[in-house]
């Protein structure tokens, strides 16, 4: 089949959207098509990241997507409150969709269902077959038997308040709340003096979260903070995978076609944040000299395997969080972590821990029972 495009991106979410934008910047003559079954690119999400998660070059090229930026953020635990002087950034799916629409226009096909994805073609449900030199599947997380995961499940609501909330920076983790049989915290982003995004977040063993309970949790938390909720502007929900263990070779045997983002297992193993790795993949693909289905598949799988090798320590920490000690005491692990030096915490989020950092994290009295911690560390699959 004669290719209609150089690249077809199936799924117009974060990872594929960033690939498209970076390729357009670096290789403006490339013919790119994005296809998604949803009505709006990016869906209904808020993506956040820390300053040190990206290089200065990466900050520059994604700058048009950034809607909010704060110079610091807060965490709260039963016996620890702390402000961390690290920049925190936010991209909204609305801005993301606007930028993609402006840049790709007729080559952004929304409300378009795909029936079959192949290495060099896509068949739509309405029957049309479109050829390309390469295809990338970025349609979000798909369960894979090679990975054992927990989930960070959440419901977030954006509210307009009747009076100013008084927050000058995000509270990315408030674990002073009732734990409700797992590690639970509330996440709050101040979007304006009278607008807040409030997320009820749970680290749990499966992706299911009672939406009515989460909504009530948000209302209760707002009341406890003295925030007077006036108008619900938007609601989002999600379940980010948190990797406990797995087999990278078996994972990629189940992914014979090029894929991106959560589908490629490219997310921070402990936080579930996917934007930094999506930016890195976009950079890597935009630098390819040869652009074929084989070269793209090789570039993504090689990158993902590199990250898998680097993330073993994080997976061990995740097992301690999910498998060691009572579920309603998991907050102790995170409370202890946030007492560590600020530069170490920044490297943790960026996935760039040094050997000294790792030793520092494990030193001292463990926040969970020693035997349970050792059993969790030795667990390779649930």
Swiss-Prot record:
Activity is increased in the presence of NAD(P)H. NADPH is not involved directly in the cyclization reaction, but must play an indirect role, e.g. as an allosteric activator. Transmembrane segments: none annotated. Its cofactor is FAD. It catalyses: a carotenoid psi-end group = a carotenoid beta-end derivative; all-trans-lycopene = gamma-carotene; gamma-carotene = all-trans-beta-carotene; all-trans-neurosporene = beta-zeacarotene. Keywords: Carotenoid biosynthesis, Cell inner membrane, Cell membrane, FAD, Flavoprotein, Isomerase, Membrane, NAD, NADP. The keyword NADP applies. Gene3D superfamilies: FAD/NAD(P)-binding domain. It is found in: Cell inner membrane. It comes from the Bacteria. Its EC number is 5.5.1.19. It is an enzyme of class 5 (isomerase). Catalyzes the double cyclization reaction which converts lycopene to beta-carotene. Also catalyzes the double cyclization reaction which converts neurosporene to 7,8-dihydro-beta-carotene via monocyclic beta-zeacarotene. May also convert zeta-carotene to bicyclic 7,8,7',8'-tetrahydro-beta-carotene. Belongs to the lycopene cyclase family. This is Lycopene beta-cyclase. It comes from Pantoea ananas.
């Amino acid at each position: 089949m004669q290719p209609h495009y150089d690249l077809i991106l199936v799924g117009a979410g974060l990872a594929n959207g960033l690939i498209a934008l970076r390729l357009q910047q670096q290789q403006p003559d490339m013919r790119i098509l994005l296809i998604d079954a949803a009505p709006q690119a990016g869906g209904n999400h808020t993506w956040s990241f820390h300053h040190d998660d990206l290089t200065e070059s990466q900050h520059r090229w994604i700058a048009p997507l950034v809607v909010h930026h704060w110079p610091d953020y807060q965490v709260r635990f039963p016996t620890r409150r702390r402000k961390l002087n690290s920049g925190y950034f936010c991209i909204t799916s609305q801005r993301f969709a606007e930028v993609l629409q402006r840049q790709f226009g007729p080559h952004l096909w929304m409300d378009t269902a795909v029936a079959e994805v192949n290495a060099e073609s896509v068949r739509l449900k309405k029957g049309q077959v479109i050829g390309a030199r390469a295809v990338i599947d970025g349609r979000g997380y798909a369960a894979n038997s090679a990975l054992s995961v927990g989930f960070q499940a959440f419901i977030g609501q954006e509210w307009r308040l009747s009076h100013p909330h008084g927050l000058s920076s995000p509270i990315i983790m408030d674990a002073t709340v009732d734990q409700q049989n797992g590690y639970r915290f509330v996440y709050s982003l101040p979007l304006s003096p009278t607008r807040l995004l409030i997320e009820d977040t749970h680290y749990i063993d499966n992706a299911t979260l009672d939406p009515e309970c989460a909504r009530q949790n948000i209302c209760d938390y707002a009341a406890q903070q003295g925030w007077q909720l006036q108008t619900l502007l938007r609601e989002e929900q999600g379940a980010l995978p948190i990797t406990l263990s797995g087999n990278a070779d078996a994972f990629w045997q189940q992914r014979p076609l090029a894929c991106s983002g959560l589908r490629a297992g490219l997310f921070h193993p402990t936080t579930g944040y996917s934007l930094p790795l999506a930016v890195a993949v976009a950079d890597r693909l935009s630098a390819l000299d040869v652009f074929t289905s084989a070269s793209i598949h090789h570039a993504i799988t090689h990158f993902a395997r590199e990250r898998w090798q680097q993330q073993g320590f994080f997976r061990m920490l995740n097992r301690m969080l999910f498998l060691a000690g009572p579920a309603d005491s998991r907050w102790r692990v995170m409370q202890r972590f946030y007492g560590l030096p600020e530069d170490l915490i920044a490297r943790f989020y960026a996935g760039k821990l040094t050997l000294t950092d790792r030793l520092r994290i494990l030193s001292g009295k463990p926040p969970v029972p020693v035997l349970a911690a050792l059993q969790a560390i030795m667990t390779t699959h649930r």
